[in-house]
Amino acid sequence: MSGKGPAIGIDLGTTYSCVGVFQHGKVEIIANDQGNRTTPSYVAFTDTERLIGDAAKNQVAMNPTNTIFDAKRLIGRKYDDPTVQSDMKHWPFRVVNEGGKPKVQVEYKGEMKTFFPEEISSMVLTKMKEIAEAYLGKKVETAVITVPAYFNDSQRQATKDAGTITGLNVMRIINEPTAAAIAYGLDKKGTRAGEKNVLIFDLGGGTFDVSILTIEDGIFEVKSTAGDTHLGGEDFDNRMVNRFVEEFKGKHKRDNAGNKRAVRRLRTACERARRTLSSSTQASIEIDSLFEGIDFYTSITRARFEELNADLFRGTLEPVEKALRDAKLDKGQIQEIVLVGGSTRIPKIQKLLQDFFNGKELNKSINPDEAVAYGAAVQAAILMGDKSENVQDLLLLDVTPLSLGIETAGGVMTALIKRNTTIPTKQTQTFTTYSDNQSSVLVQVYEGERAMTKDNNLLGKFDLTGIPPAPRGVPQIEVTFDIDANGILNVSAVDKSTGKENKITITNDKGRLSKDDIDRMVQEAEKYKAEDEANRDRVGAKNSLESYTYNMKQTVEDEKLKGKISDQDKQKVLDKCQEVISSLDRNQMAEKEEYEHKQKELEKLCNPIVTKLYQGAGGAGAGGSGGPTIEEVD
């Protein structure tokens, strides 16, 4: 691979991921080795190998407990987080608790292994990086990665860590709607005049985000964000799955709900049906031998699908109303509505949204699956100093999704940075002691919108000690909140009289990985990658031996060559070929060297015989090489 490639933009999605690059003045969304422009965010572990992307998703029905998806729902969260606990009920794979952090447990090559969500996400990112490298023919080292607008600090940090484990320099973590707005801003560049309010409606496979941005003179500013971390195509599929499990029970008096493989196959068929129903009014489901040998054939109309999900579809308008309230805008003040995420293709959702905005046209000009990666690729080019005129006058302002503050007397939340403040930002406020001769203060940092800290989320805390004795209210303690462009928070406190300072970067208290953890994971990621490559080479050597063996067998058995070869030679070749075929059947897992050694032995025996044979047959083509290699068919 020659030279250093450009920076890439990665949309690391809950269910699918997408990668783009900005070059030659335009964005290119890159297809993977299967020709798909989005790649499932799935990682599977088997007895012999690790699979990522389409290959992992395609075998999920056979291997549900060792196929990991939805890592984005775990990343940066604690094990006892209520959302983690409720998600665990629905996942076929095991999640275990290690020091308060969730880890997924799988069986890999016959051993029990556990992985942090960051490691699983890093495997998906590695796949996306490789997709880009294969297309560009260059090493890729830098990237911009996107996250949902209301990911908190630890979720952003953990996503950045996943990039680091992959070996990427993550220049910036940006919000998904901001990325979509950039993509959109470029698309609509020629027509801009004055300030525009844009609503971004992003309904993906697993999450739903609504954001309102203003765009003026190339400056994007996020005004508000709202949404539901648990709404998307998967939920619509689940409604169909439940419906069909009941139908199967009714028709066949059998309950297949407890059979993971049957449910998984049913879910895959439902996902296909949902996609079909966006363009057709009816979809059929045909699954052979779904459960206990019974075939399941049924169909679903678009109207029935809409009825099953009526409450969920209608529910998408609540976050729209909340985002409008937060941005202090009336729905009539929204100039543009942008659709992002595959589920926005559902006609009913488009209709509900259009009716809510009194028939306003929706923007569907960008492929909804690709808009976020598109914007991330543009942002990567800007940060790398791309001088192309298409990106020159774009500036990007992001916001903090939640208010940040400290606890003051009586458990009151005192916010220093209000939610939806443009970042980077720095705010300072002076506090004092609560009792006489108080020698230390505890600074507790919270995020959230409630009046009392007990209802908000504790990010971290530290003590400022050594305050000289004084009556209450006299010491002056200056607290500073500083958020950088990635949304990462530093909090410091200084005692004005002594100049004593203490500070915290909000990371570890939220279960962030330590530097040692990350370094170890980087090494492990490299080890797994090397194992994957060794396995590919091993399979290649096995296929080569197999194809050469069958080739030789065919050659000496060829009717046309009868009489050109002595029976003794023919028997020699056939015996040796049979010996190789038997050993291949017995041991599918031999080392590459063993396969190569067997092939050399076989060639040593066959080459002189084949050469004689073809000379005898008037040089009917050289057969002495390794025989044709067989291309893999997926």
UniProtKB/Swiss-Prot annotation:
InterPro entries recorded: ATPase_NBD (IPR043129), Heat_shock_70_CS (IPR018181), HSP70_C_sf (IPR029048), HSP70_peptide-bd_sf (IPR029047), Hsp_70_fam (IPR013126)
Highest taxon of the lineage: Eukaryota
Disulfide bonding pattern of the chain: none
Keywords linked to the UniProt accession: ATP-binding, Nucleotide-binding, Stress response
GO MF terms held by the record: ATP binding; ATP hydrolysis activity; ATP-dependent protein folding chaperone; heat shock protein binding; nuclear progesterone receptor binding; protein folding chaperone
GO cellular component terms given for this protein: cytoplasm; cytosol; nucleus; perikaryon; plasma membrane; receptor complex
UniProt region (Nucleotide-binding domain (NBD)), positions on chain: 3-389
UniProt region (Substrate-binding domain (SBD)), positions on chain: 397-512
Swiss-Prot/TrEMBL GO biological process terms: chaperone cofactor-dependent protein refolding; protein refolding; response to cold; response to heat; response to progesterone
CDD domains documented for this protein: ASKHA_NBD_HSP70_HSPA1
Function, in words: Molecular chaperone implicated in a wide variety of cellular processes, including protection of the proteome from stress, folding and transport of newly synthesized polypeptides, activation of proteolysis of misfolded proteins and the formation and dissociation of protein complexes. Plays a pivotal role in the protein quality control system, ensuring the correct folding of proteins, the re-folding of misfolded proteins and controlling the targeting of proteins for subsequent degradation. This is achieved through cycles of ATP binding, ATP hydrolysis and ADP release, mediated by co-chaperones.
Family from the record: Belongs to the heat shock protein 70 family.
Entry comment, domain topic: The N-terminal nucleotide binding domain (NBD) (also known as the ATPase domain) is responsible for binding and hydrolyzing ATP. The C-terminal substrate-binding domain (SBD) (also known as peptide-binding domain) binds to the client/substrate proteins. The two domains are allosterically coupled so that, when ATP is bound to the NBD, the SBD binds relatively weakly to clients. When ADP is bound in the NBD, a conformational change enhances the affinity of the SBD for client proteins.
UniProt protein name: Heat shock 70 kDa protein
Organism: Gallus gallus (Chicken)
